[in-house]
Amino acid sequence: RDTDRSRGLGDVYKRQVRFCEARVWSFYNMFNKSVGDTYLPYIQGDSKEPMPLYIKPSRKLSVRDVQAAMRDHYEGTPLDITNDPGAGPFKTPYRLSPLSFKVGDQEYFNERPISTQQTAFTFVAQMRANLPDAIGGVLWFGTDDANMTVFAPVYCCSDRIPDCYSGKEADCVTFSWDSAFWIYNWVADMIRPRYSLMIDDMRAVQNNLEDTYANAQAGIESSAMSLYEKDPVKAKEFLTNYSCMTAESAIDSWKKLGEFLIVKYNDGAVKKMAKDGTILRPETGHCAPLVRPGYPKEFLEELVKATGERYKICLLYTSPS
C-alpha cells in the first residue's frame, strides 16, 4: 500500500522506465492515435508530462485487434527499429539481449518492443459475462514470441493439458518435435535473420489458422451451450477436447511450415513456386528452379560506403611470361 497520498496510482507502477513505457505508448498509439501523438514527446524525452495509467480506445476492440497488438514492434512509428543498422539487411524488428550496451564509456539501449524473442508464452484473455463461465472464458494462448506463434483457444473449463504444452518430452535444455515451445522457436529462429524475405510465408499460415479458429468459435460455443444445458460435464469435456485439438493442429501445421521454409530458402537462395503454392520441382536433374535475391539494394549501397573499393571487381595484374 502506498502511504504517500500525494503520489498518483500510476507512480506505483514504476513510471519512467523507458523500456516499459515505450511499450505502453505503442498500445495507446495503436488504439487511440490522438493519445499516441500527445505522449510521443514524453517517450522521446522531450516532455515531462507522463502518460495516464489507462485510456479509452477510439473504437471497440476485437480479440484479433489485441492479438495483432501483441505482435507490435513499433512499425510505422518514430520508434520503428527496422530501418537502422541494427535491423541488418532484412529489416528484422528484433534486437539481441541485453537491453543496454556500452560504446566506450557511454551507455546505450536497444528498443524493447511489445513482441520479443525471449517470450516464453503469451495470451489474450477473452471474458464474456453473458455466457456460462465454462464457455465464456477463453485464453487465446501461444508459446514463444507473440509475433511468430499461433493464438489457439484454451477454454477456461479445460481440465487436460494438450500434449504439446505439457512439457513431458522437453524442457529448457531438451528439444522435442512434440513440444509447442520448441517448434515455434525452431521456425522463428529460421525467420529472424532473413525476416523481410521470409515473414510473409509464416504470416499466411498463421492467419489461416487463427482465422479458422475465430470463424469456428460461434459454432463451437453454440454446440457447447446445447450440451451445457443438458449436461455441463459433457460440455466441459467437449471444450477440453476442442482446446487440445486446436493446439495440436497448430503444431502440426507449424512443423509443415518449418519443413517448407528450410527447403524454399535453403542456402540463401529462394526456390520458385508453382501456381498451386508448392515448390517447383526440377524437370531434369536435382536442382530446383530458384532465384538468388542476394542483399537488398539499400544494404549494398551502405556496404560499399563503408568498405570503399575493398570489394570492387577488377582484373588481377599478371606479369608477362
Language-model segments: residues:
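Helix N-terminus capping/helix-initiation residues
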Residues: 15, 50, 61-63, 144, ...
